[in-house]
Amino acid sequence: VTNSPALIDNLDDLPLPARHLLPMDQYHMTATRTNEEHSYTISVARGCPFKCTYCYRTFGKKFRHHSTDRITNEIEMLINKYGAKEINLEADTLTLNKKFIIDLCEAIIKKGLQKKIQWTCESRVDTVNKEMLELLKNAGCWQISYGVESGSQRLLDLVEKGEKLEQFEHVFRLTEKVGISIRAFFMLGIPTETR
C-alpha cells in the first residue's frame, strides 16, 4: 500500500529551483514569440478542484499558490541573472483564484516587470472575464493556453470537463479582443470518438 504524499500547503516553504545546476542559456520555449529568446518557467501554484476524468491531478484538488512577493522576486532574478525575456507562469489553472491573480498582476505592474518580460499561462474559460483578461494583458501576458480537449459537447460531457462549447467561443473572442494570443489544447481519440 502506498499512501499519497502529504500536500505542501505553504508553497513558499519550497526552495527555489537549483537553476545554477542547469545550462540555462539553452532554454528556449517552443511557444515563445521568436523561439530565440531566453524563456523560463516558474511554478506559481498547485492543485485543481475540477474533476476532468483524463487528468492526472498530481498536486491534488486543493489550490495553493506561492506569495506574490516570491513570484515577482523569482521573475526579477530570472531577468537579472539569466536574461529572461519571457516566462511561463505554471499552474494547472492560473486564474482559478480571482484575488490571487489580481494581486499577482498588480504586483507585476507595481514593480514594472511587464516592461521587461512577457509571460504565458494556462487557464479555463470558466475562470476568466473581460476585466481579468484586460488586467492579464496589462501585466504582460501575451498568450493563454486553454484546454479545449474536443469540439464535441458530448465528448466534453463524457470527460466531465464542466465547460460548454459556447463558453469557448465567447472567451476566445474576448481573449483575442484584448490582444492576448490563444493556444488551445485538444485530445484526439477520446473513447467513443468517431470523427
For each predicted feature, which ranges?
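Radical SAM [4Fe-4S] cluster-binding motif and immediate context
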Residues: 18-185, 190
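Glycine-rich beta-alpha loop elements in corrinoid/cobalamin-binding modules
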Residues: 1-11, 15
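Active-site glycine- and acidic-residue-rich loops that bind
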Residues: 192-195
